[in-house]
Amino acid sequence: MEETNIRVVLYSIFSLIFLIISFKFLKPKKQNLPPSPPGWLPIIGHLRLLKPPIHRTLRSFSETLDHNDGGGVMSLRLGSRLVYVVSSHKVAAEECFGKNDVVLANRPQVIIGKHVGYNNTNMIAAPYGDHWRNLRRLCTIEIFSTHRLNCFLYVRTDEVRRLISRLSRLAGTKKTVVELKPMLMDLTFNNIMRMMTGKRYYGEETTDEEEAKRVRKLVADVGANTSSGNAVDYVPILRLFSSYENRVKKLGEETDKFLQGLIDDKRGQQETGTTMIDHLLVLQKSDIEYYTDQIIKGIILIMVIAGTNTSAVTLEWALSNLLNHPDVISKARDEIDNRVGLDRLIEEADLSELPYLKNIVLETLRLHPATPLLVPHMASEDCKIGSYDMPRGTTLLVNAWAIHRDPNTWDDPDSFKPERFEKEEEAQKLLAFGLGRRACPGSGLAQRIVGLALGSLIQCFEWERVGNVEVDMKEGVGNTVPKAIPLKAICKARPFLHKIIS
């Protein structure tokens, strides 16, 4: 025991001497860092100041600081990590995802990525390098290519038709109050799960109610723990006092068990199906060393987490804005009636001929990006962002929400004006799906399902607000920024609807 105590004392003394020498002789040169808000405290830095909603708090900080670069970059100390927050489109597009795109293509490592994200090996969390490039190539070609998306057109078409039929039965030709969020969630969950597994989990013709509840709970739990990180990620000593990592470990075990079950079910079937898991298992036979079960589970995880809540939230915000702007919904309906007609449902192939509908989707993504703070990036080496030095290891947060409401970038930025996107170059300013080599590869799928669902709802029903007051547009708490008050609206089927869905 005495020998152990002596070793501890000696280790402490040598560690202290090393720190003193390092500080005196290896002190880094003074760097030009972006301005930082007051209120920094030892150990925790600015963590105590980050009140939800974080994207609004960060914009508030940024607006109070003097920026010699014309605005848009500030620094924070979050525990042991240096974090830069960018709130300028010019800086994000030119400096971060232009000139420094490769340097900033890394991801900071967080606890949930380790225990739920298969030790940071999935496409979102993986460090930039050969493994990530292989994953990106796999997803681009085998999952999100035009060919693969077209293979699942029947799923999107069928799920939207089921949504329309469900609403038609509820409302009929009489004005009826409906709550839309549960139906929109069912739509997006079923779309992704049918692509991956061939199963409908929600609504009619479902296969396993208990498994459906399990899926939704897992997605909610992972989403609740996924953002820019937990305080434990920034102040490692908190691991000694927090149960966070143990909770995440348990969540990772539950998630892995569920995903492995999906793969085993498909592997046990005698005939090869047409789902995404079937396709990945065929690829596994050709290269078993690369297409491991872990790789496949990571892909399923990202598809489910990134492709369900986000699209449902976008649809709910879009409908909320339309109800507050009846002139916009009238204009969109006229466009659909003129170009599609009244004798058939809108189809995905029609979307390219409906520019105003597309502009409504873009304007919704501008005002209500489902990920207001883009997935964090990390500098793999020293670089410069404008006139500022960015040391290696710095975390980068891009506040897409603030950029989308920046008056230096947008005219009347807080107003809902789909017409602004009649100028094609305006769409290039959007950051809803990120920029650069780590932009979201699933943007095409998201825009297809949102465009088709929204167009169908406009085409098939007349919509009104409940009461005379405008729809409440307050933001709720959550990683994908849902509405604080779920949307309820008055719905009435248009006279021709029963003919085209019978």
Swiss-Prot record:
Similarity section: Belongs to the cytochrome P450 family.
Alphabetical UniProt keywords: Heme, Iron, Membrane, Metal-binding, Monooxygenase, Oxidoreductase, Transmembrane, Transmembrane helix
Protein name from the UniProt record: Cytochrome P450 81D1
Subcellular location field: Membrane
CDD domains named among the record's database cross-references: CYP81
Cofactor(s) annotated in UniProt: heme
Keyword 4Fe-4S belongs to the record: no
Binding site residues for heme: C440
Organism, scientific name: Arabidopsis thaliana
Matches recorded under PROSITE patterns: CYTOCHROME_P450
